[in-house]
Amino acid sequence: MRYLAAYLLAQLGGTGRPQESDIKNILSSVGVECEQERAKLGVDQLHGKNVRDLINTGKEKMSAVSFGATPVAVPSGGAPAAATAAAEAPKGGDKAAAPPKEEKKEESEESDADMGFSPFD
C-alpha cells in the first residue's frame, strides 16, 4: 500500500512516470523504510496503466467482497413508508398477516478479520 500511495503522490506532484528513486524519496521523507525490490516491483506493475482505471477496478473488486451484513433495500421515504405500511396492515387478531420478528444475531469479531483479501500485499 505504501508503495502505491507513494507512486500516486509522485504522479500528483507532476512526475509523469515515477521511478524507484521517487518512491524512496517520498517514503523516506515521512520516515518510512523503503524496500528497493518492492518499490521496483510496484513501479514495474504500474507502468503504462491509467490510475483512474486502476481505482475503478479496485472499487469493483471491493464491491464484490462481503463485509458481513446483507444490505436491505429501503424505499425512498424510509420511516414514513414503514408507518404507512403499518397503518394499511389488517387490524385485529390476524397473526398470520403479521410480519415475523427479526432476531438480532451477534457477529463474532472473527468475521471482520478475513475480508477475502489482504490490503498489505
Curated annotation (Swiss-Prot):
GO CC field: cytosolic large ribosomal subunit
Organism listed in the record: Taenia solium (Pork tapeworm)
Keywords, comma-separated and alphabetical: Phosphoprotein, Ribonucleoprotein, Ribosomal protein
InterPro entries: P1/P2_N_sf, Ribosomal_P1/P2, Ribosomal_P2
GO terms assigned for molecular function: structural constituent of ribosome
Quaternary structure annotation from Swiss-Prot or TrEMBL: P1 and P2 exist as dimers at the large ribosomal subunit.
Entry-linked CDD domains: Ribosomal_P2
Similarity comment: Belongs to the eukaryotic ribosomal protein P1/P2 family.
Record's compositionally biased regions (Low complexity): 72-99
UniProt keyword Ribosomal protein present: yes
Protein name (record): Large ribosomal subunit protein P2
